[in-house]
Amino acid sequence: MSTQEATLQQPLLQAIDLKKHYPVKKGMFAPERLVKALDGVSFNLERGKTLAVVGESGCGKSTLGRLLTMIEMPTGGELYYQGQDLLKHDPQAQKLRRQKIQIVFQNPYGSLNPRKKVGQILEEPLLINTSLSKEQRREKALSMMAKVGLKTEHYDRYPHMFSGGQRQRIAIARGLMLDPDVVIADEPVSALDVSVRAQVLNLMMDLQQELGLSYVFISHDLSVVEHIADEVMVMYLGRCVEKGTKDQIFNNPRHPYTQALLSATPRLNPDDRRERIKLSGELPSPLNPPPGCAFNARCRRRFGPCTQLQPQLKDYGGQLVACFAVDQDENPQR
């Protein structure tokens, strides 16, 4: 097998047991405690596919996005791009991270420098990371603007002169200027009007087909996720509780938390009715999580081991679920 063939068989992006713990002290003499914002998350992202990461605010999904782009460094775990270790502190790994993994932020009003024109915003990554001439940078910026539906005359305008949807198109174009393979999309449409969300989503899907992009799509909106995802990872308090294909998650959710999230999602078909599952209480504090399963205080299927032990992901026909109740359903004799 050639080196190229071996590379193509590897996941494009692979995370193994990624962790991010923040030390916290409440007073000068208080003992240091840890907030486990991310606590052992693993996944494989294949070329040209979209992995959606979903969950309530505070579940750790945005922290995961920051780790994947090295905005923050993980406390532990491993991260590979086509088999190459991205956590090595060497110039080659850093260059690879900058060029091959880019991010599109949630807020198009805050992520663009108001003092710079669109052309300057788009050319800045090229100015920092390439040796292209001024004319070459301009040519590439105009080409990318056309790809995202912006006009040539927009090149010399400032961000405040655009609508929210147009600003997010600028942000997407900026994220693609270095020809990345992976784009981390952190709630890319949540700050937009409903009327333009579908346009931006369709643009992202068209760009994925045209450029062969892979997305890690972070969202709390399952109706949006259903439109764009190939695989879905459900997170709760820093951990993955369920992972599977889009069809598995939406048609046969196994974890009680996933079931509750989906029951709250509006359906287009009025005949497609689900039992409304109402969760009691709020997301626990990551500074003081409950013993056992972090979801046990809100779970309607809680029983003995849920309050004592932390469930691990188990494979049920290709669908990974971390739940003692599901395990009991599959193995009632235990």
Curated annotation (Swiss-Prot):
Membrane topology (UniProt): Peripheral membrane protein
SUPFAM superfamilies per UniProt: P-loop containing nucleoside triphosphate hydrolases
SMART domains, A to Z: AAA
Protein name: Dipeptide transport ATP-binding protein DppF
InterPro entries xref list: AAA+_ATPase, ABC_transp_ATP-bind, ABC_transporter-like_ATP-bd, ABC_transporter-like_CS, DppF, Oligopep_ABC_C, P-loop_NTPase
Gene3D superfamilies listed in its UniProt record: P-loop containing nucleotide triphosphate hydrolases
UniProt-listed PANTHER family: DIPEPTIDE TRANSPORT ATP-BINDING PROTEIN DPPF, TRANSPORT ATP-BINDING PROTEIN
Family the entry assigns: Belongs to the ABC transporter superfamily.
Encoding gene per record: dppF
